[in-house]
Amino acid sequence: MVKIGLEVHVHLTSLKTKLFCSCPSDYTGKDPNTNVCPICLGLPGAIPVLNENAVKAAIMVALAINAEIANSLIMVRKHYFYPDMAKNYQISQYDGPGSIAISKGGYLKLREGKTVRIRRINIEEDPAKIIYPTGSMLTSKYTLLDYNRSGMGLLEIVTEPDMTEPKEAREFLEKLRSILEHLGVCNCDLEGAMRADANVSVEGGERVEIKNIGSPREVEEALKYEIARQKAAIAQGLPVKRETRHWDSERKVTVPTRTKETEEDYRYFPDPDLPPYPITQDLIEEIRKTLPELPDLRIKRLVTQYGISDYDATVLVMDKALADLFEETAKHYSNYKKLVNLLINDYLRWLNDKNLRPSQSKAGSQHLVELLKLLDDGVITIKIAKEILPEIVLEGKMPSSIIKERGLVAIKDEDYLINVIKEVINEEPDAAEKAKNDPKVINYLVGKVMKKTGKRADPQLTNELIKKILGIK
């Protein structure tokens, strides 16, 4: 039996400043170690002050995942010795004596009905960024530290070990990401904005933690590898150590980094510089009123409002930018099913293949409306639409402009198409004969015509002309 639990670290990118000081939270483009102050660097005598907006963001997330919110917030010091934490402790929270996490409980439901319970949400500070300039953690000759990130506000969302397959962990993270984006508390496209530690054990063995994985897809890959590694060790009669491992995304393997600490090793105790922060019911209700439409409700609305399937609505809403693009385009194009098919089967598939997200695309609703109308009017074929998609997405070019530049208008000249079809029939006499009794072979001949015309032949007209020439009724 496999047990999987997750610890998800979410940057509160909606904050203007860091968690305990006034340093800006946006350090994009700044030189290393310039977005810092005595508090970020843990210098003696520097006193932290809690950013109240971080508390409000955490309450929003807790409400969205059906959690029980505490009536006060108590921060603790989590002690460990590692170069990314200058003061040798992290200001965090702990589910134990002397601390109160901002929320406990809660859950998310996966597509097939499985419930993943959430143990708690903690507010904590982010450590510095460790850089390996000449390779990976294992191969780099030296290490650099950038404290620009140190002290950024984080939420740590800890699940129970309710998942049994890597694909469930990926789905959980994708759904959580959608919630965070709908709430507006995290821009998950930013590097490192959402990272996960995956804990996994096989057949009741020791728990292994895979640290700092950058995306839902990589979490799935890392877990697949780690489960296979543990099963192989068990089959050979070898022990599985309780340890922390690193996911090497280039080699697609996990590698050991250190023995896994126990809770006692961290020597938690309340931070004397940060008094308890009260959370009133009035504050919770005030924040509840500001919650936007969340993914589950949006899925139901899309099904009702646009008549699309529950599956299609779910795929759209799992990425807020994709759902937003659908709804904006639907204001100007009423064939919703055709729009969904283009978005999911062509647009999203291409983005996934290139490891891009919809929010990184330069295609807007105006691009999609024009592309769909060109298809409806028979000006281009679906093959041409797929061919020009990269230029639309990466450069933001209008479809009509690309078609004009590259001469990609669909060919509807019957005389021209008949000549091409006759060429194909002469080259493929056996296929032409089989086509008289097998409709599937007609599609093969259509494909040959498309190839000869650079994908520009109108497929429906070509199909009709082939049947006419071969005497197929």
Swiss-Prot record:
Keywords, sorted A to Z: ATP-binding, Ligase, Nucleotide-binding, Protein biosynthesis
Molecular functions per Gene Ontology: asparaginyl-tRNA synthase (glutamine-hydrolyzing) activity; ATP binding; glutaminyl-tRNA synthase (glutamine-hydrolyzing) activity
The keyword Metal-binding is assigned to this record: no
Entry's Gene Ontology BP terms: glutaminyl-tRNAGln biosynthesis via transamidation; translation
Complex formation: Heterotrimer of A, B and C subunits.
Protein name, as recorded: Aspartyl/glutamyl-tRNA(Asn/Gln) amidotransferase subunit B
Function comment: Allows the formation of correctly charged Asn-tRNA(Asn) or Gln-tRNA(Gln) through the transamidation of misacylated Asp-tRNA(Asn) or Glu-tRNA(Gln) in organisms which lack either or both of asparaginyl-tRNA or glutaminyl-tRNA synthetases. The reaction takes place in the presence of glutamine and ATP through an activated phospho-Asp-tRNA(Asn) or phospho-Glu-tRNA(Gln).
EC id: 6.3.5.-
Keyword Oxidoreductase: no
PROSITE patterns, alphabetized: GATB
Taxonomic placement: Archaea, Thermoproteota, Thermoprotei, Sulfolobales, Sulfolobaceae
HAMAP family per record: GatB
Domain of life, source organism: Archaea
Family named by the database record: Belongs to the GatB/GatE family. GatB subfamily.
Reactions this protein catalyses: L-glutamyl-tRNA(Gln) + L-glutamine + ATP + H2O = L-glutaminyl-tRNA(Gln) + L-glutamate + ADP + phosphate + H(+); L-aspartyl-tRNA(Asn) + L-glutamine + ATP + H2O = L-asparaginyl-tRNA(Asn) + L-glutamate + ADP + phosphate + 2 H(+)
Enzyme class (EC, first level): ligase
Species whose genome carries this gene: Sulfurisphaera tokodaii (strain DSM 16993 / JCM 10545 / NBRC 100140 / 7)
